[in-house]
Every structure is written in structure tokens, then in C-alpha cells.
């Protein structure tokens, strides 16, 4: 008599090993195969195994050429050449497998907020592990661009620390006489609300405002910022950090960055360390410094230096993350028109690894964004099945009559660095 062993009869350890080899982009299809597979993916012990990378492996999500990729960097010591493995393109934003172009992406504990490159700059929150999405349409989109051809909106994804309900912060706040507008989207109410904010700071400021990406930590988002004043010197005053608290829906005070002064040609960017700490990178062409927080709250912060290396590198983006155990920083950028990671050790050693093919940044520039990634069990709350709540007459007046009208009037008379595309307003 012939005995046949089915998948369901295999030992749990063997099933774990099989599923651990499934590429991130294929997890949704495998989970839909049967209830047993789905249950195994939901099991937290499996999640821990999946999150535990191989020796020397750093797993990440990378935005390259307006597409998202799952990627691993293998690094086993400064004396050994590093290598990269592209684990697959993440392509399930549309059910019909139509690939979309992504202009920006923001990370919050396994969830990704993607800003799409379409005529409305649609927003979608995505959990690649579950394959879940939630599409959100902005109320209005200004088509004014900065000198790098990027729209002047700033986004952040966070959550209420009491209810764990997710929210999206969106604002436009240019330099000098440009009107500002801060608004927040609540996943529970499915509504946008204008915030009462009179900023005493600049977050989206020239010349590198288009690169000032916020970092979300424990539900709140942090940015580098400068104090708002009429005679601001854009090149020397970047010496603060500011936090937006998604629970209170308020900004905290400006808090000092650990280095002395930001000088012309320098770059300052933020990163998250194991969802526990913030890190800040300071590069002034000749020196690279990385600092890590030892204490962080919405209104208090303290720092400890992680490493200092004398090296010349001309960074535009400076997306980075660090490995505290190996004492290295991985800095991602596009020098000489090629996506590259610099692996910098505390002893001053530097390894350089190319990730993709050369690109023509003059014709087709796309930012290189990287974040460390661990699959998340968080379910994205979907809009209520009943009729959507109506926004109040006060909010409608604040949105239409005040903010949108001001932006339209400003667009008709103002061009930022000579770049302007007619605006589109969502029908209301």
C-alpha cells in the first residue's frame, strides 16, 4: 500500500522552513491558498522566525525608479565585500496587477504610505505582508513644484497611541509669503480636518526641502526643522528637530540637534533604529557623523554619538539606517547617477555597493528611499460600510473658502523656481 503525505501532514518545523522561503511579494497569494497556510502566516512564532534575518543580512524596502522592491544587504565584516539581493518587486497595489508609479513612500511600523504619480497624487496605505490597501483621495492638490520638480506637500503616517487608530498628516508650507495649510485624515471617521497651526518653524524649506522626509517612531513623526524668521539663512540655521503628536494632533517645541551648525553643502537626515530610537546623519562633504537618541519624547530629546568618519561623499538624499551590533551605518544615495549604498564602519572603513543600473537623473530623477522592514500583523482599518460621515459646515468653509481659495489665488500669481502646472480641485 502506498502512503501519500500531504502538505497538512508535514511537521510544523518543515512548514515553517517552506513558508520562510516565500518571497514577500508572493505572501498574499500563498495565504489565500488555504486556511492552514493563512493560519501559519498569522502565527507569531513564525513571524519572529521570518523577522530574524540570516547572519549578516539586513532586510529593507527600497524605492528605486518609482517602484518598490524588497531587498537584502549582506554584510559580514568590513574586510568582506558586501552584496545585495533583490527579493522581488512589490506589485500588488492594483488587483489587476497593473503597476503604478510611486513618487514618495513613508513607513510606519510595517505599513507604507505611498504617494502615487498620477494626476491626483492619490494616497494609498499598504501592508505588503497582508496585501491590504486603503485608498485615500486628497481634497485638493496644488500643482506648484519646487526646483527639483517635486510637489510641495509634506506627508506623515502615524497613529493615536490610545486607540491605535491610524492618521495621515498632510501640509503645504513654503518659504516666505507662500500660504500654509495643515490637515489630518482620520481612518476612523474617513474625513479630512483642517488643523489650527501657526508654525513658528519651517519643515519644507529650500534648498533641500524636497528631501526632508519625516520619520515615524512609536506613532509620532519627527522632522528636521529651522526656526521661522524673516531673515533666515537657509544654509546655516538647520539645528532643530520637531515632533508631531498624532494623539493630541499637535506639534511639540523645537528641540536641538546634537551637532553645532549646519553649513553650506551639508545634509541632515533622520532614520529609525529598530522602532525604538531615532538616528540623525550629518554630512558636510568631508565628515559623516551619526547620532542616536538616548531619550526621546515629544518635547525632550538627548543624543549620543554613534560614529564619526572622515570621508568625502556628495549626498543628495542620505536615506540611511544603522546596525548597532556591527557598528556600521548604511547610507543610500545616487552619486554619479547610480543607486549606491555606502557601508561606513566606526574605524573609518567604507565599503561601496552599487544597487542598480546607471540612471539619467537629468531626464528621469527618482528619489532613492530605504527603510528597514519587518512584516507587520497590523490590519488596515477599512472605511465604514455605511454612508460616509459628512464634514461640518465649519470645516467645509475652512477648506473651500479659506485654504483652497488662498492656494488658487496664490498659484495664479506665484511661480516657485519657474515650475507650475495648473491645479486640480476635487469635486465637492
From Swiss-Prot:
Residues 4-50 form the F-box domain. InterPro entries: F-box-assoc_dom_typ1, F-box-assoc_interact_dom, F-box-like_dom_sf, F-box_dom, Gal_Oxase/kelch_b-propeller, SCF_F-box_component. It comes from the Eukaryota. This is Putative F-box protein At3g22421.
Amino acid at each position: 500500500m502506498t502512503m501519500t503525505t500531504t502538505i497538512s501532514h508535514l511537521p510544523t518545523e518543515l512548514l515553517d522552513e517552506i513558508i520562510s522561503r516565500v518571497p514577500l511579494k508572493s505572501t498574499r497569494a500563498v495565504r489565500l491558498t488555504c486556511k492552514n497556510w493563512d493560519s501559519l502566516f498569522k502565527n507569531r512564532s513564525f513571524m519572529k522566525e521570518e523577522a530574524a534575518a540570516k547572519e549578516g543580512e539586513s532586510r529593507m524596502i527600497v524605492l528605486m525608479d518609482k517602484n518598490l522592491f524588497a531587498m537584502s544587504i549582506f554584510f559580514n565584516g568590513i574586510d568582506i565585500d558586501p552584496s545585495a539581493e533583490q527579493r522581488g518587486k512589490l506589485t500588488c497595489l492594483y488587483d489587476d496587477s497593473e503597476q503604478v508609479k510611486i513618487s514618495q513612500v513613508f513607513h510606519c511600523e510595517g505599513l507604507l504610505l505611498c504617494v502615487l504619480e498620477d494626476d491626483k497624487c492619490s494616497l494609498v496605505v499598504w501592508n505588503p505582508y497582508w496585501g491590504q490597501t486603503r485608498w485615500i483621495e486628497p481634497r485638493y492638490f496644488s500643482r506648484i513644484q519646487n526646483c527639483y520638480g517635486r510637489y510641495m506637500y509634506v506627508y506623515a503616517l502615524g497613529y493615536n497611541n490610545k486607540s491605535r487608530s491610524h492618521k495621515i498628516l498632510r501640509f503645504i508650507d513654503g518659504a516666505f509669503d507662500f500660504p500654509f495649510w495643515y490637515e489630518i485624515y482620520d481612518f476612523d471617521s474617513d474625513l479630512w480636518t483642517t488643523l489650527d497651526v501657526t508654525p513658528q518653524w519651517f519643515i519644507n524649506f529650500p534648498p533641500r526641502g524636497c528631501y526632508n522626509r519625516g520619520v515615524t517612531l512609536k506613532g509620532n513623526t519627527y522632522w528636521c526643522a529651522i526656526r521661522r524668521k524673516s531673515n533666515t539663512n537657509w544654509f546655516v540655521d538647520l539645528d532643530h528637530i520637531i515632533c508631531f503628536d498624532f494623539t493630541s494632533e499637535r506639534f511639540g517645541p523645537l528641540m536641538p540637534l546634537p551637532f553645532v551648525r549646519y553649513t553650506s553643502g551639508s545634509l541632515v537626515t533622520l532614520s529609525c533604529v529598530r522602532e525604538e530610537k531615532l538616528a540623525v546623519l550629518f554630512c558636510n562633504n568631508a565628515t559623516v557623523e551619526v547620532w542616536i537618541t538616548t531619550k526621546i519624547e515629544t518635547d525632550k530629546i538627548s543624543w549620543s554619538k554613534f560614529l564619526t568618519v572622515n570621508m568625502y561623499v556628495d549626498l543628495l538624499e542620505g536615506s540611511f539606517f544603522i546596525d548597532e551590533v556591527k557598528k556600521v551605518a548604511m547610507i543610500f544615495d545616487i552619486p554619479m547617477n547610480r543607486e549606491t549604498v555606502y557601508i561606513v564602519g566606526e574605524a573609518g572603513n567604507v565599503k561601496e555597493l552599487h544597487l542598480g543600473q546607471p540612471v539619467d537623473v537629468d531626464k528621469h530623477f527618482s528619489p532613492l528611499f530605504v527603510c528597514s522592514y519587518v512584516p507587520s500583523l497590523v490590519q488596515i482599518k477599512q472605511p465604514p460600510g455605511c454612508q460616509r460621515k459628512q464634514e461640518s459646515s465649519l470645516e467645509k468653509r475652512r477648506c473651500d473658502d479659506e485654504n483652497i481659495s488662498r492656494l488658487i489665488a496664490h498659484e495664479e500669481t506665484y511661480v516657485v523656481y519657474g515650475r507650475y502646472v495648473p491645479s486640480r480641485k476635487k469635486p465637492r
